[in-house]
Amino acid sequence: MLRSEPPVLFLLFAAGALSATETPKVTFLRDVAPILNKTGCTAGACHGAAKGKNGFKLSLRGYDPQFDYEALLYDLSSRRFNRADPARSLMLAKPTQQVPHGGGLRFEIGSGYYKTIYTWIAQGVLFGDPAKDSVRRLEVEPREIFMNAPGESAVVKVSATFADGGQRDVTREAVVESNVPDVAAVTDASVKGTRIGEATLLVRYQGNFATLPVTVINPKSGFAWKSLPQANYIDRLVDAKLQRLKIQPSPTVDDAGFLRRVSLDLKGQLPTPDEVRAFVANTSRTKRSELIEKLIASPAYVDHWTLKWGDLLQNSRKYLGEKGAFEFREWIRDSIAQNKPYDHMVREMLMAKGSSYDDPAANFYRVTRDPKPTMEKTTQVFLGVRMVCAQCHDHPFERWTQNQYYEMAAFFSAVGLRPGYEVGEEILFDQRRDFDMKHPKDGRVMNPKFILPASWSGTGAPPIDAQRRQAYAEWLTARDNPFFAKSTVNRVWSYFLGRGIIDPVDDIRASNPPSNPALLDALAKDFIDHNFDLRYLMRTIGNSRTYQASVVVNEWNEKDGENFSHAMPRRLSAEELMDALALATGVQPVFPEAPPDTGAEQVTDPHVGKDGFLDLFGRPARESSCECERRSDLACRRR
């Protein structure tokens, strides 16, 4: 049976005898929606699921307050509210379990949340004014949490500034989550350090996000920083953080270990026994930097990086046909061999047109074909941003909205493909009929718009798609685009160090911050200052002491896995492993459809040697542009 009027509220409203004008107005936007989010009603496991829960649906994590308000107001013919007797409203009875509720108890009768919703119903379930009640800024205190030992705790305070200038402490309603719970465990707004390491707290409130870094250092006494040689700015920035965290870096690896490591990383091949003996016997103080130059200039370097870019760009005859895949591979290979500036390489793909055989860069569009997957691929590969979550709803962990998803996709909406004159040839053009990008919710036409401000030579969003693509290409590769250079150096860094400064490398977002922001900024600036030169970037990383560190750990860095204080053991890729076995045994593998003496790294397509050794050890099928498609775990897949 429902209670008609709890004593607490009776005293609040009857004894106070407040008039409607004296009672502060409670609105859905400012007061009620945060409660639904905090209590989990809009979570993916509850009513925020794609199809809702038990016949009732809300937007995921409350990204669409208008939809949620209308669902509450009009679903069940408005039977969720009883204005004559608010306490008998289903919206209060279910979460307090006065009637059966699959979600269990969400809050108690008489609690602060109960009182807010009660007042909202009594005042007429007002939506509120977005021009006044929307959150404009979220602030978190402290700015950083630094704990001297596991077991220490800290309290997080969250305040919101609304569109009308009003401010409120929203600590109780804000959602605070840790990206590494076994380092920083969160209970409501309290965080406790549980082990040595680093974590980031993501604070969410009404579509706004803030992050808070948490560091728990080693409490062990006796630490004394021992300076090691610093080859360049990479070492200075890495050491600055390590010293602060009481982590002593490992010394450099020996010559044989360095030769093996850099040979695999730059050309994907092990050194021969003769090369090992010669390098170890060499007494030159500059032999390591000279070796890097030699490897970068080798044909094997071109093969190795052609393979990597072929994976990312999904070069496969499944999508492109045999000739298309060959032509695209040769274009990638020529770009690597010429050391084409990376921004030029990307612009050539984005601005390609005409025959997929005459302009092989046009094959980039033949993989995804449609505007939405094309946009998703360009942002993930070239910016490290995953927009796919925003196709159906606002991104739950980032600022990207569903509107922005379709505005970005509109840059490619008129791109079309038609058959060419040769077998398998397609012509890329920019005048597809009915090319308007429409929002799935209401059908309105979405005009192209950048997700972030950056430079390009035009003004506004061009009306013709050829110009749209030009605008997009210039914006994406602009020197002041905050993601382009950073995502590139971060990806390349991961190839050499085993993990990115931001990891995963293609998931850059506020809730996945860099482990060393100063290092990432410096690498990006250096890359831009040297005109997006990939070889220069690799040379800079390879010559650093950080890259050349030993895998052997000490008592101060044995638990470090994020700050590059020592090298991380890495498994050889499928192609590297096969070529290594060929070198060790003297038995050259034979690939169907490939010339004799073809190495595994020279195989042009994932369909060559399909379901054999390479696939067993993790070769990607090039079905996705995600780095995660290549398996590098130690367990073999069962067949």
Task: Go through each PLM region and give its residues.
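Hydrophobic h-region of N-terminal signal peptides that target proteins for export
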Residues: 11-20
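Solvent-exposed helix-loop boundary motif
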Residues: 19-114, 132-159, 168-231, 260-261, ...
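Catalytic cores of secreted or luminal carbohydrate-active enzymes
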Residues: 107-127, 636-639
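Periplasmic/extracellular electron-transfer cofactor-ligation site
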Residues: 37-60, 119, 123-132, 386-402, ...
